[in-house]
Amino acid sequence: MGEKPGTRVFKKSSPNCKLTVYLGKRDFVDHLDKVDPVDGVVLVDPDYLKDRKVFVTLTCAFRYGREDLDVLGLSFRKDLFIATYQAFPPMPNPPRPPTRLQDRLLKKLGQHAHPFFFTIPQNLPCSVTLQPGPEDTGKACGVDFEIRAFCAKSIEEKSHKRNSVRLIIRKVQFAPETPGPQPSAETTRHFLMSDRRSLHLEASLDKELYYHGEPLNVNVHVTNNSAKTVKKIRVSVRQYADICLFSTAQYKCPVAQLEQDDQVSPSSTFCKVYTITPLLSDNREKRGLALDGQLKHEDTNLASSTIVKEGANKEVLGILVSYRVKVKLVVSRGGDVSVELPFVLMHPKPHDHITLPRPQSAPREIDIPVDTNLIEFDTNYATDDDIVFEDFARLRLKGMKDDDCDDQFC
């Protein structure tokens, strides 16, 4: 029999190693009707804490300008959501009892570990990063979620980097289990001096939902009853990013293009299936392209389509991402014809892990010294499986140079 796999837990310590935050995951899923709760544990050195308190904050922020342009007290950043939790001393009426993971961590880490809990509102945007240009420095623009733990006498007191922990988490969405109808569109163009003859274009996709890296099959059917000749057919995939902040603006960027010299003569028909695949690897140099939030040692991808719950307040949302396929007929002597097909580009929903029920009774555990620097804790207690601790990753884009170790994400 093989060894039982451990439960992975992410950790990150303050520069002075007096404060350590533990989280069971970095990605929190928006299920439209609810969002996964943020439950973690903070471990504190009691000799260092003295008469101070331990606070944990969750912030959702939208950075819409370069960090090096923040001058004269002006910041190109808007906080969309801020929540604060006092981890120590514990509140007299905690919002909820510890989760199973928190309970296990509290037992392993000892009496100086304290739980914290946050609920992410449903109307907040998902984590999106706008791809920086080659000359851009500092933090990339976009929407991110940050957890910060620090020691202070009050929440208003300014915290210091040496005794605080900052780490980035992601709010993500996965593909719906039931996709929508097959996208299709058609249009007819009548030309002057053509004796009421027309050029008809019909296009469709084989389905509405595609996963990242999956090719799109675009079915194009042309009926040319006009006197003009279709010289070329262009198929492109465009990303649309609606920036909802002080006002709403839409930016579009082609992420895949295909051009074929397929001619359609007058009084003839044409039918063909074009295959096109939108990939980030073909768009590395495009500044402002929306990407999914990325973690260290993990390559990112084009931003997933945003699914908005019906009735949601779009003014609160930071970046809404959508995709369309555009089919264009290049006609001789002008008068091009085109249609657009909206589709959804997302990651598939991963298989849910089976959570074993908590045992009704358990033998009393013996207090043993715990080395919090260990990567893996081996125990033989039947009521608790192994926990594997992994250092929390710093948020960066692939190809970007690492900053100094005092960076808040290191």
Curated annotation (Swiss-Prot):
Tissue localization of expression: Predominantly localized in neuronal tissues and in the spleen.
One GO cellular component term: cytoplasmic vesicle
Outcome (variant: residue 54 to A): Inhibits internalization of EDNRA and EDNRB
Region (Interaction with AP2B1) location: 378-410
Residue list for modification Phosphotyrosine: 48
Subcellular location: Cytoplasm; Nucleus; Cell membrane; Membrane, Clathrin-coated pit
Alphabetical UniProt keywords: Cell membrane, Coated pit, Cytoplasm, Cytoplasmic vesicle, Hydroxylation, Membrane, Nucleus, Phosphoprotein, Protein transport, Signal transduction inhibitor, Transport, Ubl conjugation
Sequence motif: [DE]-X(1,2)-F-X-X-[FL]-X-X-X-R motif, positions: 386-396
GO biological process: adult walking behavior; cell chemotaxis; circadian rhythm; desensitization of G protein-coupled receptor signaling pathway; detection of temperature stimulus involved in sensory perception of pain; endocytosis; follicle-stimulating hormone signaling pathway; G protein-coupled receptor internalization
Family the UniProt entry places it in: Belongs to the arrestin family.
Subunit comment: Homooligomer; the self-association is mediated by InsP6-binding. Heterooligomer with ARRB1; the association is mediated by InsP6-binding. Interacts with ADRB2 and CHRM2. Interacts with PDE4A. Interacts with PDE4D. Interacts with MAPK10, MAPK1 and MAPK3. Interacts with DRD2. Interacts with FSHR. Interacts with CLTC. Interacts with HTR2C. Interacts with CCR5. Interacts with CXCR4. Interacts with SRC. Interacts with DUSP16; the interaction is interrupted by stimulation of AGTR1 and activation of MAPK10. Interacts with CHUK; the interaction is enhanced stimulation of ADRB2. Interacts with RELA.
Protein name: Beta-arrestin-2
Organism, scientific name: Rattus norvegicus
